[in-house]
Amino acid sequence: MPFERFVQTGRIAKASAGPLKGRLVAIVDVIDQNRVLVDGPLTGVPRQEYRLNNLHLTKYRIKFPYTAPTRIVRKAWTESDLKAQWKVSPWSVKAQNICKRSSLNDFDRFKLRYAKRQRNKLLTIAFNTLKKRTKADGTPRVLKKDRRERLRAEKAKGGKKAAAKK
């Protein structure tokens, strides 16, 4: 699969360093191989030059003319409904989860650790029961408990059949 995230007019990027860290910006113009002119009218980013080393390119791109003014960038941004698309993207969800994790206090971390321990205990029990029920070659093993239940069920059915015949 070829590379598809090019530095181009309309490409949406996420600032990774500096005062704009975490904000989305649109590339308006490429100044040189290291710098671009960015604008983020709906994310509170004024039009300014920004280093490419401090940007992460996203898969999103909005259509507007080369070196368009801020009002046209704003219009294209709102028409593309970029905010909603970004909120459901895995990248955004992961960033929000990292933010939530970093804001946990000591008691929240304890509750999380306790819940994980409980979940893992349930998973281990379920795995071990399945492991007991299978042989080394992968075929299901009939346990004594299963055999007893099956015999009881057959007796119950046999009793009904015998009663029906009489």
Curated annotation (Swiss-Prot):
Any Pfam family the entry gives: Ribosomal_L14e
A Gene Ontology molecular function term of the record: structural constituent of ribosome
Sequence segments annotated as region (Disordered): 135-166
InterPro entries assigned: Rib_uL2_dom2, Ribosomal_eL14, Ribosomal_eL14_dom, Translation_prot_SH3-like_sf
GO BP annotation list: cytoplasmic translation; negative regulation of neuron apoptotic process; ribosomal large subunit biogenesis
Superkingdom: Eukaryota
Claim: Cell membrane is one of the keywords in the record: no
Organism name: Drosophila melanogaster (Fruit fly)
Positions with biased composition (Basic and acidic residues): 146-157
Gene Ontology annotations for the cellular component aspect, listed alphabetically: cytosolic large ribosomal subunit; cytosolic ribosome
Keyword flag Calcium: no
Disulfide bonds: none
Keywords for the protein's UniProt record, in alphabetical order: Ribonucleoprotein, Ribosomal protein
Family of this protein: Belongs to the eukaryotic ribosomal protein eL14 family.
Protein name in the entry: Large ribosomal subunit protein eL14
